[in-house]
């Protein structure tokens, strides 16, 4: 576009670039290419690559490393712009990526896995016109930032321009993946010292086992009858983390998380050695800041967390179901929830107008130039 052509050079320099180089067949072969077989999962569909981070502001910080590459995501695999996952193992060179990907002050500079989020569900490549019309690229990052501002551990998030074998592939959102290695990098110990689960319509084990998870679900079913049992809940789950996690979803009106869409995209990690409580992490929240009509009226309230749209799905093992049982029946939990909500919604708290707006604007400034390049790559995809 002549309106933005003059901005392209500055747009390409406004964030770091990540270059991925590999045998073209690893990407595009009908038989073995991961971009030609986007439904492929697991190590059978992992391909060796070379990556290079390029920092236009600090060229001396640029570096190269070996890694593995997989597809990432679920529904977005049908989009032309796909999410990807970088895996670092000794097989490829270094066991971990050692680089200040999320800034010098981030809790860790070592990473086993990095997800390259295409944010396809809320972008110009989406098949839904309302998604394309409301593209921001920021909902999921804002959710993670908000969870951190509320005082909880969260997954790091940043932005890069991605190149695949020299071809510009668009603006991507690298983020940490909450699992056992994430626990090791953030809290110490070894990755085997952690259990991690993801609920994508049912509970999937990412690391360790879900034995303690099942015990927690069973324990929560007794909370209505016994104050003693409620007081023991802290042994199973970080209650303040649970409350604030739900507050983030309620504040942002999530449509693909612990809501009536199917109790989806819930990531939790706990330390098993020594034993600790489960903590929930904001994850894949791009379907948020919307109302039930999909018109992006950010102030329109709608009833989330009901089971009405879940059909015959069993949602009793959902963390949102634990929350519902507590919210509806336990006075002490209700008071605790009210205290947390007041803390975050008023007096400059993380969910106050001034706090939330400042945090969102900070991310807007980070990518407002970079999206010019994204629009050149993908802006006319659905026209």
What are these regions (language model features)?
Residues 20, 38-206:
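Conserved ATP-binding subdomain of kinase catalytic cores across diverse folds
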């Amino acid at each position: 576009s002549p309106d933005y052509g003059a901005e392209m050079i500055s747009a390409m320099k406004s964030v770091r670039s990540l270059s991925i180089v590999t045998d073209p067949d690893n990407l595009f072969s009908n038989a073995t290419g991961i971009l030609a077989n986007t439904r492929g999962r697991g190590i059978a569909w992992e391909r060796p690559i070379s990556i290079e981070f390029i920092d236009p502001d600090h060229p001396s910080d640029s570096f190269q490393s070996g890694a593995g590459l997989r597809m990432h995501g679920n529904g977005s695999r049908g989009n032309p712009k796909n999410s990807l996952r970088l895996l670092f193992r000794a097989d490829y060179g270094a066991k971990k990526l050692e680089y200040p990907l999320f800034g010098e002050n981030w809790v860790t500079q070592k990473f086993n896995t990095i997800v390259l989020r295409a944010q396809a569900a809320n972008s110009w490549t989406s098949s839904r016109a309302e998604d394309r019309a409301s593209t921001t690229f920021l909902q999921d990052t804002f959710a993670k930032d908000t969870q951190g501002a509320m005082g909880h551990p969260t997954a790091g998030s940043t932005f890069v321009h991605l190149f695949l074998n020299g071809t510009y592939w668009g603006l991507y959102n690298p983020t940490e993946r909450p699992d056992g290695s994430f626990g090791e990098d953030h809290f110490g110990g070894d990755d085997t010292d952690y259990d991690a689960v993801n609920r994508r319509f049912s509970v999937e084990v990412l690391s360790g086992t879900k034995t303690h998870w099942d015990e927690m679900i069973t324990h929560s079913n007794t909370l209505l009858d016994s104050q003693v049992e409620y007081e023991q809940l802290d042994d199973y789950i970080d209650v303040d983390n649970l409350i604030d996690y739900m507050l983030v979803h309620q504040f942002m009106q999530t449509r693909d998380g612990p809501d009536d869409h199917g109790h989806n995209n819930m990531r939790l990690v706990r330390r098993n050695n020594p034993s600790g409580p489960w903590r929930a992490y904001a994850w894949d929240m791009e379907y948020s800041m919307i109302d039930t009509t999909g018109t992006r009226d950010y102030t329109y309230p709608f009833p989330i967390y009901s089971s009405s749209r879940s059909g015959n799905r069993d949602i009793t093992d959902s963390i949102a179901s634990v929350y519902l049982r507590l919210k509806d029946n336990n006075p002490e939990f209700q008071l605790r929830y009210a205290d947390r909500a007041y803390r975050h919604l008023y007096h400059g708290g993380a969910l106050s107008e001034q706090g939330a707006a400042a945090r969102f604007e900070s991310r807007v400034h980070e990518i407002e130039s970079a999206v010019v390049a994204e629009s050149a790559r993908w802006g006319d995809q659905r026209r």
